[in-house]
Amino acid sequence: GVGVITAGDSGGSIIKFEAPGSEKTVHADAVILALGGGSWARLGSDGVWVNWLKQAGVKVEALKPSNCGFDVTWSPHLRERFDGQPLKSVVLSFGSFHQQGEFIVTKEGVEGSLIYAASAPLRDAIEANGKAVLELDMTPDRSHEWLVERLSKPRGSRSMSSHLEKTVGLKGVKVGLLHEFMPKEEFSKAERLAA
């Protein structure tokens, strides 16, 4: 590959690139370096360029995680029962972030495209507050009123999980998350379930 050998002078930049069998010098007024992060060393993104730039007098912000999953302290039941289960067609909201997509519940927490998209604001909140509390709409194509009306129907002898599946189509990991985060006394209240 190509590696930077030297850089910098007060009248612009002189950069030397060394490639197999040749060397090239480039004079530039400005240089944009696309060097990758520090999380995939086996693919070349090892972050070693940070120290090189600092030694050359360039101010470099610390590398921070991005496009990453997050740890969640699940109950043993959720961790064992729903590890690897996808949450599809959900809307994740956090501050000004609001996006529909999908992600996966893992034993350690959450990961997947929707989580990666929200990773920067979630990371910043965790750095500032020690935690991030997000909102998840598991039925984004249904109105609050429709959900309340359907969930208010008598469930008879059916379990609450069966009632949720029959009336509004919630099942599996989505019901597992409701059990995980809703107080038991509110789990049978249609208005709270629809919120």
Task: Identify the residue ranges that each predicted region occupies.
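Short secondary-structure boundary/hinge segments and terminal tails
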Residues: 5, 70-72, 109, 123
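Conserved beta-strand-loop-beta-strand element in the redox core of flavoprotein oxidoreductases
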Residues: 2-26, 31
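Residue-level recognition of phosphate/Mg2+-coordinating polar/acidic sites
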Residues: 16, 30-34, 40, 91-195
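Glycine-rich loop(s) and the adjacent beta-strand/alpha-helix scaffold that form part
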Residues: 30-76
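Short, acidic/polar N-cap/turn motifs at the starts of alpha helices
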Residues: 1, 12-14, 23, 87-91, ...
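Acidic, Ser/Thr/Pro-rich intrinsically disordered regulatory segments
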Residues: 71-102
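Internal, well-ordered alpha-helical segments in soluble enzyme and binding-protein domains
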Residues: 45-52, 78, 86-88, 100, ...
